[in-house]
C-alpha cells in the first residue's frame, strides 16, 4: 500500500507489545536510551526486537529504509539551540515534483515559512548534491527511488542545548546518544557526523516497483501551517495522489 508521514521524529524508537500471562491484555515495552544496556533481549536470539532506535546496529532496521529519512539525520528545528533562528520553512529544490503541483513554488522558494511549517521534531536524510545541484539521499541503505523535494536545516541537541523547560528535568543528550550508537563513541568527529542534519520533504518506494509510494514531510509543526495555501495544497496533493495510486 501507500503511506504518508506528515510529522517529525517518526519511527525513531522500536517498541514491543507483550502479552500478559494472565491474558488481561498487553503492555508496551520501551527502554529507549538505555535499551542497549538494560533491555533483557540484548544478547539473545530476539535482540533485533530491542526497544531502542530502529537504526541502532543491534536492531538493524533503520526507519529511512521505509520513510526515506530518519531522525538520526536531524531531530530538532527551532527548538532549544537547534537552528534557533531558522526560517521555519522548507527550501524548494525539485519544483517539478508532484508534491508541489499547483503551489506555484519555484526552486529556492520557501514553503510554509510564514506559519512555521518546520519546527520542533524532524526527519532528515544524509544529503548530497547530484550533478545538477539537486539534493539526493546519500546513505547506502536509502529507500529505493528516494526523491528529495525540499529540506531545511535541523540538528540533534547536545547536553546543555535543550530548552530550559526540558533541561530542568534532564537533558536527553540526543547528539551524544546517536553518535555513540551509530559511530561507537562521542569523539568530536562522531559528534560532527550527527550534528548537521535536516528536515526533509521526499517520496520513495521502499519495496521498489512492486510496492507503494511513501510521502514523508518531516516536521512535527507541519500541521500548524495548514492555513498557508501552499502547505494546504501539498497536503491535498499527498492525500489525493496516494489514494489514487493503485495498491500493490
Segments and roles (model prediction):
Residues 1-114:
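A glycine-rich, often tryptophan-bearing local segment used as a flexible ligand/cofactor-contacting loop or short
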Residues 12-32, 37, 91-94, 98-248:
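Extracellular ligand-binding/catalytic regions of CAZymes and related secreted enzymes
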Amino acid at each position: 500500500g501507500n503511506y504518508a508521514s506528515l510529522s517529525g521524529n517518526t519511527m525513531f524508537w522500536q517498541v514491543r507489545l507483550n502479552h500478559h500471562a494472565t491474558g488481561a491484555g498487553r503492555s508496551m515495552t520501551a527502554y529507549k536510551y538505555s535499551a542497549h544496556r538494560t533491555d533483557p533481549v540484548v544478547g539473545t536470539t530476539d535482540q533485533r526486537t530491542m526497544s531502542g532506535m530502529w537504526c541502532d546496529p543491534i536492531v538493524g532496521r533503520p526507519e529511512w529504509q521505509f520513510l526515506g529519512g530518519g531522525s538520526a539525520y536531524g531531530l530538532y528545528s527551532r527548538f532549544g539551540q537547534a537552528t534557533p533562528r531558522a526560517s521555519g520553512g522548507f527550501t524548494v529544490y525539485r519544483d517539478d515534483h508532484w508534491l508541489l503541483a499547483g503551489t506555484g513554488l519555484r526552486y529556492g522558494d520557501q514553503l510554509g515559512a510564514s506559519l512555521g511549517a518546520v519546527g520542533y521534531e524532524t526527519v532528515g536524510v544524509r544529503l548530497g548534491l547530484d550533478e545538477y545541484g539537486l539534493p539526493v539521499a546519500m546513505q547506502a541503505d536509502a529507500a529505493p527511488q528516494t526523491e528529495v523535494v525540499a529540506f531545511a536545516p535541523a540538528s540533534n541537541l547536545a547536553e546543555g542545548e535543550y530548552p530550559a523547560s526540558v533541561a530542568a528535568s534532564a537533558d536527553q543528550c540526543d547528539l551524544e546518544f546517536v553518535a555513540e550508537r551509530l559511530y561507537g563513541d562521542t569523539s568530536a568527529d562522531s559528534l560532527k557526523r550527527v550534528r548537521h542534519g535536516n528536515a526533509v520533504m521526499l517520496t520513495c518506494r521502499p519495496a521498489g516497483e512492486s510496492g507503494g509510494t511513501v510521502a514523508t514531510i518531516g516536521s512535527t509543526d507541519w500541521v500548524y501551517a495548514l492555513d498557508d495555501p501552499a502547505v494546504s495544497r501539498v497536503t491535498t496533493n499527498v492525500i489525493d495522489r496516494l489514494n489514487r495510486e493503485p495498491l500493490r
